């Protein structure tokens, strides 16, 4: 394992993960890399997706007490319809003025299906308490959702639950990332678009890292974005949830993740506003009287919680542009800073000599 602090910082801010599995931040900080190595069932129609999800839920039920992480979105609402009456569900609720409250819609789905419903309240204090243990297990800074999932997993464990069920990867597998799929992107355009933080504004040694995207550059020079998401982002996103559940001693189950779209994604439909068209069809069949809910990310009100945060910063981080970042971008810088200060230290850490960085910016 190569010790490469500079690469790992750049990789995390760009992709929220260390993309080279032979590198680590520093000695003793071996990263935990997640790979979801399961057989994936090809799905062509809403009927096939329905049958697949029913089978997956039945398999989960055979392995002990389960609960569903239920949001206001289609993906978990569909899963709720397959669960036996009385099954426990949990909804995350961040206590911040700017946070979307999904509890009402989630409660409606729970009531429709005769399920128990519990709200897991999330506060900034939870981040102060749980972020560093999650980073320590992972050997890397974390995604902000990991703290929320970890608290929910602890709650579920106290309730006697063995496995938490998530709707994760439905967006990746069925065309939910409509903004990324909205147009064609060249390699350089997509590298800039996908990067979560502009490393030139944060790091003293910024690098351009394109290795996860390069295998998906097509002969015409454009990036196969759907292929990139199914390949790279699939494992990265599942890793967020798995790290949190594993630290809590909770089983993780994602029924969508063992499927794959069995035919080319209809980009024209996506670009006309019909994202996740197979999931839309299935949702409307299960809940014919309900409108298609708007796509919303899991709530994480970092714009409020980190509104005034500016440090103190580790020496490798630059302060000038932090105030202009979005809440989510501030989280990634904050998390990297916490990781560096706690696990790397502010003195006697290895930095490259001038000109030694790979692909410097």
Spans of model-derived segments:
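RNA-binding accessory domains that recognize and position tRNA/RNA substrates
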Residues: 1-65, 345-361
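Short, hydrophobic/amphipathic alpha-helical patches that form generic packing surfaces
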Residues: 5-18, 151-154, 228-243, 329-346
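ATP-dependent adenylation/pyrophosphate-handling site
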Residues: 59, 64-113, 118
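Glycine-rich phosphate-binding loop signature in dinucleotide/nucleotide-binding domains
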Residues: 60-64, 156-162
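Short catalytic/ligand-binding loop motif for oxyanion handling, primarily in non-cytosolic enzymes
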Residues: 75-79, 99, 126-128, 172-176, ...
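A conserved beta-strand->alpha-helix junction
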Residues: 103, 107-137, 163-168, 205-212
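Mid-to-C-terminal catalytic subdomains of enzymes
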Residues: 164, 169-187, 227-324, 351-360
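Short, flexible loop segments at boundaries between secondary-structure elements
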Residues: 183-215
